[in-house]
From Swiss-Prot:
<keyword id="KW-0548">Nucleotidyltransferase</keyword>
<dbReference type="GO" id="GO:0005524">
    <property type="term" value="F:ATP binding"/>
</dbReference>
<dbReference type="GO" id="GO:0004515">
    <property type="term" value="F:nicotinate-nucleotide adenylyltransferase activity"/>
</dbReference>
<dbReference type="InterPro" id="IPR014729">
    <property type="entry name" value="Rossmann-like_a/b/a_fold"/>
</dbReference>
<keyword id="KW-0662">Pyridine nucleotide biosynthesis</keyword>
<keyword id="KW-0808">Transferase</keyword>
<comment type="function">
    <text>Catalyzes the reversible adenylation of nicotinate mononucleotide (NaMN) to nicotinic acid adenine dinucleotide (NaAD).</text>
</comment>
<dbReference type="GO" id="GO:0009435">
    <property type="term" value="P:NAD biosynthetic process"/>
</dbReference>
<protein>
    <recommendedName>
        <fullName>Probable nicotinate-nucleotide adenylyltransferase</fullName>
        <ecNumber>2.7.7.18</ecNumber>
    </recommendedName>
</protein>
<keyword id="KW-0547">Nucleotide-binding</keyword>
<comment type="pathway">
    <text>Cofactor biosynthesis; NAD(+) biosynthesis; deamido-NAD(+) from nicotinate D-ribonucleotide: step 1/1.</text>
</comment>
<keyword id="KW-0067">ATP-binding</keyword>
<keyword id="KW-0520">NAD</keyword>
<comment type="similarity">
    <text>Belongs to the NadD family.</text>
</comment>
<dbReference type="Pfam" id="PF01467">
    <property type="entry name" value="CTP_transf_like"/>
</dbReference>
<dbReference type="InterPro" id="IPR005248">
    <property type="entry name" value="NadD/NMNAT"/>
</dbReference>
<dbReference type="InterPro" id="IPR004821">
    <property type="entry name" value="Cyt_trans-like"/>
</dbReference>
Amino acid sequence: MGLKTGIYSGSFNPIHIGHLALANWLCEFEGLDEVWFVVTPHNPLKKKDDLLDDSLRLEMAQAAIDGYPKFRVCDIEFYLPKPSYSIDTLRTLSRNYPNRDFYFIMGADNWQLFPRWKEHEKILQDYKLLIYPRLGFDISIPAIYPNVKKVDAPLMEISSTFIRNAYQADKDIRFFLPEGVRPYYYKI
């Protein structure tokens, strides 16, 4: 059995304290050894128009986790064909890191869309999934999916969209952003 490594894929547009709190909770209370923040250049189910620059999102993610040994930023999707599909990311990571057991971290909102994902049945078969709560989304996991687990992480309704909108409305959002991210974000 390898290192239990959570794969937390996202646009991180920008990364915020909700992302970090969830990842920390998964390490401390679900027993993950590490969480890798996989910055996604293009989620096939979202518009790319609203995304901050790829390299800026990657830099902000790195600044957000700086000094925390259980977190790592991963840019693997920058080198894979676009748009980014989770099955391709997971396969590549599994090949490159055979001594790790990968756990795919997903919100309840994405769990409801999961049947639309590329090769979702293969993900269910080959990887463990950790589904965290999101306000307004039920987490129903059929018994036929033994690799899928609902986690009881605290509900934090902070989103990157909320942060971008608040920033554009000239609101003080400093406490929603990790300290290392603030200098980057206020320059945008």
